[in-house]
Amino acid sequence: MENTRAKTTRNSLILLLTATIWGMAFVSQSKGMDYMHPFTFNGVRSLIGAAGILVYILISRKIAGDKAAKLDWKLNVKAGLLCGIFLTIASTLQQFGIKYTSVGKAGFITTLYIIFVPMFGIFLKKKVAPVVWAAAGMAAVGMYLLCMTESLRLGAGDIMVFLCAIAFAIQIMTVDHYAARIDGAVVSCIQFTVCGVVCCIGALILGQPTFGQIQEGLGALLYAGVLSCGVGYTLQIVGQKGLNPTVAALIMSLESVIATISGWIAYKIGFLSTDQTLTPRQIAGCIIVFAAVILVQLPPEWFRFGKKNA
């Protein structure tokens, strides 16, 4: 019992660290915009992340030796390319959006993908639980408070990040479609490579990248690439093993809260030049969005009132 409890505690802390790394990555993404075009940042960051995951794959397969699972390369490459397309769309929209909105707002809007995933199940002829629609309604109210201006307009950055959440939901559903038949690390490496190559092409066409830009923003690039993509992904794999999926999802949801706090701290200490302070109305919106995200992840049996177990 103690060993199981210790393992659960350890894995929970690992996922909390992962959520912290990913939440703080929004700060590095925002900082990177001071030095280079969004395509440049996204391209270099993704290639760094792909390299980090490749190292993890090589080490883990070397340790496994003859016990390493045989790969269906054709299927893994197909899944990686398809997931890479949606990842490219999602991460590009997010990176452009962060340029025009605050770190905290970007963090909370991005987490809406957690609600979109079960909602979009309707297109796959899956039954959507009533609680999902309730969460969607709450999220809409939260989004209104968080993003709507006095002139009843949404900011360009908020719209881009909202579309990014939709793209992330589709990307996650694509991964889920192949999950049982692929190696998650291999597919992740391929999809980051696809994203990196496509964004680097976009940077060459639109961003006019220079070595000086990359050198000045190297700290932000390394954090977003090595820690957020490489280390964060590896920690997620380790932390989720043997942990209750609901607990894991709830811990990972803290990414949005951490993004808001880290963005505010980064502004206060002068690391970010754009004001990251949220108004009371926006904070209320954040709370409602977060509550909706939590609600949609709770076990279905929690909502079966009046039913006795057989």
Which residues are covered by each model-predicted region?
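C-terminal transmembrane-helix exit sites in multi-pass transporters
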Residues: 52-57, 113-134, 257-281
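Helix-helix packing/entry segments at the starts of transmembrane helices
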Residues: 19, 44, 106-112, 175-196, ...
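Hydrophobic transmembrane alpha-helices of multi-pass small-molecule transport proteins
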Residues: 53, 128-148, 168, 199, ...
